[in-house]
């Protein structure tokens, strides 16, 4: 390895120039007549040559030749070009590169100045447009139906903007109303009363209102001599209906028979009527015999029910006594004729 780190290789880090240009003319020389032509791109990046600050634009190796031969008199080696020139077009035309680079830099500066002037002019035009009358939906300005013909160029587009900062002064237009919404439905009266109840007035006309019956006034109790109302008299029972019964072939009315008695306590006690033609004891049950019978603990205001006898059983008693020649005009003692099966618990004796 050498002192400069070139690994003893000739032209380390350099490319040898090609012998001749092989008849290629990739870039025409820039003459005075082409100074006003514009570069291929607006900013001229295609022709611009960026050179690092630590490499001069035309730096050659120390072994470059002068006057065709080096100082040693030996045949000159082909000139070597630094690798930075591979990235640009300097290796094609080394004699014109410096002049072309200066012309490009001058033309680029002129183009930037022109763009800045154009931007200022466009900004002033935008301010004028903003201060102008607002533009309605094209082509109508102001009143609808009146087209303005003295403005051939509208404020919507700037023809001289050259693709930058186009200003559109279009107001947001409302979306068009569909035809279905424009057609208003015809006014139709609502006759959907099918199945509903008729009005109250019609029902009142069909039916006559019921007249409430007048309530009978309550009779006030006639005051007595002292001014106090008289006490209600006990309700008297009506006459007994005749009950015809055939006893031993003789029609007999049992309603005329005197009330039977029970002498289980030693003193005869009248029995109570029970059911249809039956009788009930007022002093005895199957277990006790006392008068009056004790009060029922389960039913308030009622006593224990005594033994009972149905109408059929009483008829049998009458047939038996009539066969023995008993005078039925005398009260009958039912002490020995009560049923043996007990008493009815639900009979109330008052």
From Swiss-Prot:
Transmembrane segments: none annotated. Residues 43-74, 93-125, 137-241 are annotated as: Disordered. It comes from Hordeum vulgare (Barley). The gene is BBR. Belongs to the BBR/BPC family. It is found in: Nucleus. Residues 51-61, 96-122, 199-218 have a biased composition (Basic residues). A motif (Bipartite nuclear localization signal) lies at residues 199-219. GO terms for cellular component: nucleus. This is Protein Barley B recombinant. Ubiquitously expressed. Residues 179-192 have a biased composition (Basic and acidic residues). It holds the Pfam family GAGA_bind. One of its GO terms (molecular function) is sequence-specific DNA binding. Transcriptional regulator that specifically binds to GA-rich elements (GAGA-repeats) present in regulatory sequences of genes involved in developmental processes. Positively regulates the homeotic gene BKN3. Keywords: DNA-binding, Nucleus, Transcription, Transcription regulation. One of its GO terms (biological process) is regulation of DNA-templated transcription.
